[in-house]
């Protein structure tokens, strides 16, 4: 069975917390959503931090029997790229976390919109 949920999130610092709550709600039938919450939080935080600051952030969650796909779309000129982060730096680890926690991830450009997605295994 597949279920899909889509929400518009505010383009501000509250978006990541709202996204984590939506992951918990969408995954109410799975046992372990911690990885999915963290991936969603990083995707949304990156959209907010690196986007143009216009419009909303759109998050879509698609849940199948064993995988949760998290897709976050926002207005952005860039593409995701990992940067070297200093140990004491508070940022720069988002894509590294996504890469470690997701079984697959990528991005798509849709006109002026960047969509970044990640598939997280749900036991």
Language-model-detected regions and their locations in the chain:
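Short, well-structured hydrophobic secondary-structure segments
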Residues: 39, 44-49
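Conserved short strand/loop->alpha-helix "switch" segment adjacent to the catalytic nucleotide/phosphoryl-transfer site
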Residues: 17-41
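STAS-typified acidic loop motif
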Residues: 6-18
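Residues in soluble alpha-helical coiled-coils and helical-bundle/repeat scaffolds
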Residues: 10, 28-31, 106
């Amino acid at each position: 069975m597949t279920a899909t949920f889509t929400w518009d999130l505010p383009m501000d610092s509250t978006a990541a917390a709202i996204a984590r709550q939506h992951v918990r709600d969408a995954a109410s039938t799975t046992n372990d959503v911690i990885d999915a919450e963290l991936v969603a939080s990083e995707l949304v935080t990156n959209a907010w931090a690196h986007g143009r600051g216009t419009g909303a952030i759109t998050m879509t969650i698609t849940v199948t029997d064993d995988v949760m796909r998290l897709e976050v779309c926002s207005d952005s000129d860039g593409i995701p790229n990992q940067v070297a982060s200093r140990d004491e730096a508070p940022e720069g680890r988002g894509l590294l976390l996504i890469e470690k926690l997701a079984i697959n991830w990528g991005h798509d450009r849709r006109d002026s919109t960047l969509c970044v997605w990640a598939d997280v295994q749900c036991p």
